[in-house]
Amino acid sequence: MPVAMDLMKRFHMSNRRCRFSGKQVCRVVATRRQILEQTSLGFGALAARVLFAEESDAPSRFDNPLAPKAPHLTPRAKSVIFMYMDGGISQVDSFDPKPRLAAENGQARPFAIDATVFNQNGNLLASPWRFKRCGQSGIPISDLFPQLRSVADELCVIRSMTAFSANHPNATYALHSGHARLGRPSVGAWVTYGLGTQSRNFPGFVVVHGGQMFSGGMSNIGSGFLPANYQGSMMLPSAPYLPNLLRQDVSAGVQTAKQRVLRQLDQDLANSAGENSVIEAAIANHELAFRMQSAAPELFDLSRETAPTKKRYGLEAEYANTRKYGTQCLIARRLVERGVRFIELTINPGNSDRWDQHSDLKNGHARNALAVDQPVAALIKDLKARGLLDSTLIVCTSEFGRTPFAQGTNGRDHNPQGFSMWMAGGGIRGGTVYGATDEYGYRAVENKLTVHDLHANMLYLLGIDHTRLTFRFGGRDVRLTDVHGRIVNELIA
């Protein structure tokens, strides 16, 4: 190992006996920061300790925190694809037709309302899109989503979803964590904490990022008070995909030599620290990053997909954002095939300010729908054709809906009182509609659901009892659903 020996000679070394085995060990008298600075290691290169653990006779003390765990219940789904439609899709323009809006378009609203964000509240505003009953189930879907109509019988449309807040950051964070205040783990982190992942080469919680940053920031995919292993890992749908992951060394041999040095540092630090979850988590993350160096290029190599498959997902579409979201959906399917537990897709920021159309509703919503309609329908069909839909739970939702009356002349304000979302796949009763808003589409009046209910049912379908998934924090056993959440049998096949 001439390269490794050369690196070792850069640092003063001393001998001492291991307090566990009594054997003489070599100790590098240098800080980890010094090693990293001197050897120019990136995060990915740091990760090869696992390579040498396999060569060692000594048993590893570092259990994989992402290893699969037994569910509480019989699972209906193994993976989740969470499609976050940032900004607020209008329920009365997508999945909740309201004939009275058309009949009374332009008239003063005949019902009381709560305060809106901008208080520029106009008259009733009819949808510019027509609805059509689709599939054998007859679920009404508007002209916004012509491709999604073809999979209507796979969807369970919930028309009675509610939100905690009318503000983007609070509502977005509540959707992701069950709470409107920062510091809580994301639902993806909870799922990975509860079940681990079936993938050895990828994190359990992956975000395929379209570019639109979350309102409220990265805490929406964070691990909160859970160990950092469970936070979401961001991937991009185009190069460089995973920044700073690829090996920077001129050869694999140089990287291997560096890892032999760092392995001694890791083991010495771990032995000195004793049982330390922070250190063990860091080492486990390094090991995962090393494995990803080999696995990630294959994941993102879409040349392995057939031309018809790429066309169905919209990778040849005229609209750039359709191509981008289509790539995200295709990567999501490939992550499911590789055993990743929780996958979130975010949207592209170039779609007329997300789904947040306070003005020019018709053009803004049309562009947003054009970006996602074809890819989402293709993903559902592709998963079904491959026998994966029954084990993959798909959730598509915004943080809240929009008002059935105008903001200004041609927009809609935020509405947390009642809105639509849908689920499909693993354990979901397809071809159904659950809940209802009032005759104008403003407020949920039948079978109202909260984010706690949504999370409880997501966990249930994955085989997790939401009342038993807890983590000790602040002197109490905390759970994703707090003291709330109910299982809705009507949603479940």
Predicted segments with their positions:
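Ligand-binding pockets and gating/stacking loops
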Residues: 2-493
